[in-house]
Amino acid sequence: MILMNLIEALTNPDTFFKKLSQKEISLKEPFLIVLIFSILIAISAYISTSIIYKIFPPQYQQVLAFTKIIALISTFIGGIVAWLIIAGFMHLISMIFKGEGSFKKTLSFTGYGFLPNIVGALITIPIAYYMREISQQEMRL
C-alpha cells in the first residue's frame, strides 16, 4: 500500500496530494522518505570525498580521513535540517498569502517532495561509485 502511494506521488502528484490533504496528517512516511534521502546523500558524499581523498599525497591522507567522516555525518544531518528549513520557508510563504493549514501539514507535504530526490540519488550513487573506481584505476597506472 505504501509503495503504491509513493509511486502515485511520483507519477500523479496532483491526485496524490489531493488524497493526502483529505487524510489525517502523519509524519511517519515523510520522515522515512527524508531519512532515506539523507542516508543516500551521506553515502554519495562519502564516495565523493573518497575520490578527492586519493588525490592528495599519503602524508595528508591521515588528516583527510577525518574529512570523510565529517562529510558523511554533516550531509546526513543536513538532509533532515534541509527538510525543516524548506518546510518552514514554504509555510512562511503560505502565511504571507493567507494560506490555511498547520506547519505539520506543510512538513508532511514537503517530506513527500523529497521523493524525487531519492530517485535521483539512486541514479547518481552508482555513477559516483563507478567514477571512484575509474579514478582509482587511473592512479594505479
UniProtKB/Swiss-Prot annotation:
Its main location: membrane. The keyword Signal does not apply. The chain crosses the membrane at residues 32-52, 69-89, 109-129. Disulfide bonds: none annotated. GO terms for cellular component: plasma membrane. Signal peptide: none annotated. Keywords: Cell membrane, Membrane, Transmembrane, Transmembrane helix. The keyword Membrane applies. This is Uncharacterized protein MJ0794. It comes from Methanocaldococcus jannaschii (strain ATCC 43067 / DSM 2661 / JAL-1 / JCM 10045 / NBRC 100440) (Methanococcus jannaschii).
